[in-house]
C-alpha cells in the first residue's frame, strides 16, 4: 500500500526523524492559510499524488509570497499530473503539501528495501541525491553503498556511521545522519514497510540533516496489524477495479491487453499471462481468485474483469486442488448468467472433480469453449478475440 508524502513525513516525525514543517491543504484557501501558519519567507507547494517524478512534471513550486502560494495552489489543484510513473493518463491532484523552504547545501539518497538475494533488509545510500536511483545504479553503480542488516540485531550504529562516511556526509553532521538512519530503520521495521526512501536527504545551510522528500510503501499482507496505517489509504489514488477486488480478497492488477484472465494461484496466473503472450495475445489483467473461491467470488471476479472496456474475451484457467472444479464451474455458469456475458469465454479445468465441473459447463447451455490444456486454452482465446 502506498501513502502520500505528507503522511510519510508525519510518521517519520513521530519517530524523531527530521523533516521540514508542513501542512496539507485540500483547497486554495487552506494552502494560503497553511503558508501563513508556517510563517516562512519561502514556501514549497507540492502536489500530492502516488507517483514519483512530480518535480519534473511541474508538480513542485517554490513560492516567495502568499500571492504566489495562491497562484501555484490554483494551478495545481485539479490538474492532471503526468510523470514517468503515472502512465500517459496521469493522476489528478486533489491535495497539496505546503512546506517551509530550506537552504539546501547538498542532496543525498537514503533508502531501505528487502534484498531478496540475501533475505535481509538493506540500507542504501548515495551522494547522488535528487535523481532517480535506478539511473545512478545503471550508470555509476560504484556511487551506491549498501549495508546489509542482520535481522537478529537490527541496524547497528557503526553501519549507519560507515554509510554516512561513504557518501561523504560532513564529519560534523555524521551523528545527525546516524540518528536519522536509525530512526528510518525503526519506522521500516515497526510499520512493516516494503520500501522506505528518502530522496533527497539534504544537508541545510544551518547544519541540519533532514528528509526533503519521503516515500513509504507498506506490505499489504501486514496491514491487518496496522490500523493506523490503513487510515492513510487514499482510494482516489488506486484503480477502482483493484479496490473492488480487495473487498472480496481477490488479487487483481489491471494491464493494457484485451484478454481477461481468471486464475487460481499467483504462479499459475503469471504462467497464464506468459502463455497468452506466447501465442500472440495480450492479457488485460492479473487476477488470482485464491484457493478458497466461492461462486460469489467467481461472480465478482467476472464483474471486475468486464468493467474493463478493453476486454474482448476471457480465459479461465483453474487447477482444482483445495478448490474443487465443480464449485468453480457452478460459479462460472452463475456469473455468466448474472452479467449477461456476450464475449468469448474459454475455460480450462484440471484437478479435483474435474469431470463433474466439465459436465456442469456442458449442460449449462451457455456459449463456453472448453480447453484440454493451458496451451490449448491460450490458443483458443487468442484466436477468438482476433
Curated annotation (Swiss-Prot):
Binding annotation for ATP: 46, 53-55, 99, 102, 107
Note describing how the cofactor binds: Binds 1 Mg(2+) ion per subunit.
Gene Ontology terms, MF aspect: ATP binding; magnesium ion binding; succinate-CoA ligase (ADP-forming) activity; succinate-CoA ligase (GDP-forming) activity
Pfam families xrefs: ATP-grasp_2, Ligase_CoA
Cofactor(s) listed in the protein's UniProt record: Mg(2+)
GO process terms (BP): succinyl-CoA metabolic process; tricarboxylic acid cycle
EC number: 6.2.1.5
Pathway given in the UniProt record: Carbohydrate metabolism; tricarboxylic acid cycle; succinate from succinyl-CoA (ligase route): step 1/1
PROSITE patterns for this protein: ATP_GRASP (PS50975), SUCCINYL_COA_LIG_3 (PS01217)
Record: residues binding substrate: 264, 321-323
Keyword ATP-binding assigned: yes
The keyword Metal-binding is annotated on this UniProt entry: yes
Binding site for Mg(2+): 199, 213
ATP-grasp domain: residues covered: 9-244
HAMAP family for this protein: Succ_CoA_beta
Protein family: Belongs to the succinate/malate CoA ligase beta subunit family.
Quaternary structure and interacting proteins, as annotated: Heterotetramer of two alpha and two beta subunits.
Function description: Succinyl-CoA synthetase functions in the citric acid cycle (TCA), coupling the hydrolysis of succinyl-CoA to the synthesis of either ATP or GTP and thus represents the only step of substrate-level phosphorylation in the TCA. The beta subunit provides nucleotide specificity of the enzyme and binds the substrate succinate, while the binding sites for coenzyme A and phosphate are found in the alpha subunit.
Protein name: Succinate--CoA ligase [ADP-forming] subunit beta
Gene source species: Geobacillus sp. (strain WCH70)
